[in-house]
Amino acid sequence: MDAQAWDRIAGAYFDEISTPFQAEVVNPLLDYLDGLPGREELTIADLGCGIGNLLPFLAERFKSVVAVDFSANMLRAAQENCTHENVQFCRQSLTDLSVFQGQFDLVVTVNSVLAPSLNVVDQILRETAATLRPGGILAGIFPSMESVLYEGGLILDWERQRSDNEEQALRRAQRRTKRGSYDFIAGLYTEGEDRQKLYYSFELRRRLQKAGFRGLQFGKVLYPWHEEDGNVRFSSEPRLWDWFVRGSVASGQPHHD
């Protein structure tokens, strides 16, 4: 989705977007940030801040906060949602963060690296690394492609229980999971004119390492099963998830054109 698409949905964000800040979501990012030693003296950036869901939390815990987004309407909503004096708002594409080179102790990115171009994804991750001071930390949430496959497997088994014909069960599962909307090699989901990136864990690790991040640790943001999705029948199964990733840069990262 481009800046204009995000501009259009800014006023109805929670109607359009499933976020890790909604009720019943198990989001380890918040506890991680809360437990950082010396956070009161740190400068943190929220890259792709959207309407500012995380900003009040950050402003109350860190010395200074820089909120970055390429959507003017998202930034306007973020400013309304967070009026703390230690927050600076900047309209900037994540593909060029050279203005912030080496300025941050910590960056968070919450489902913000969604570009369908792998070249753009790699560029954003390099730019993100370059904003960090030596030893600086990335704490990011990224949509999981394995979670899509996991849900598909559950749906297939459900359909098999309802049918003696395995091929018919597979066709039903494919329809329910919108198989035609996914590119499982590139890790892309398409809906109408919008395309977005999802990540395999092995792929995300590799891309972050190439961007300059080290000491990577993976966890999960867990989403509840929703009845309106038709998946309440899986409520006893492990939840769907996004990836929660932590990593650091060992030294200052050069800016890449």
What are these regions, as identified by a protein language model?
Residues 1-39, 57, 139-171:
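Conserved class I S-adenosyl-L-methionine
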